[in-house]
């Protein structure tokens, strides 16, 4: 029986940090990476969008993210799926914000019973790797079966299709 795969992602649009400075993007680095996963392994793709959008201005967005982490916030998500029960494998894609996953990722995961589901994280960043996100997610959702994640430099996401695709295929085998 073939695995039922869901790739979820949160990706920031607007001003984004790159090694050579702040740039304005219409498509975030994490969205690019999530699309590569979807292309490689199929299944369904779901973008996590908050009811109250994050600022498109880099510094304001950083302050919003820090405030959410500091208060353990769970921002409301738009258009949540009624159920994720058909899926046994879920790729969880996010940028490293304040050393962990954005709190909207937790908002999504809090909504569902993850018992026995295989969760596979992918984290975009500009040098901080996965940060504490893998540990934090495993601690918050211990009933899931967590697989080793992949750290992708955000500015290299667009040129990482082969690496991401091969990792995704290996992760579900």
What annotation goes with each model-predicted range?
Residues 1-89, 99-100, 162, 166-172:
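N-terminal beta1-alpha1-beta2 submodule of the flavodoxin-like/Rossmannoid cofactor-binding fold
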Residues 24, 28, 99, 127-131, ...:
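Soluble non-cytosolic domains of exported or imported proteins
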Residues 40-44, 93, 152-155:
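C-terminal lid/capping helical subdomain adjacent to the catalytic/cofactor pocket in oxidative enzymes
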Residues 49-51, 121-125, 148-154:
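A short, structured active-site edge motif that brings together acidic residues
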Residues 55-145:
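Helix-loop-strand module that forms the ligand-binding subsite of alpha/beta enzymes
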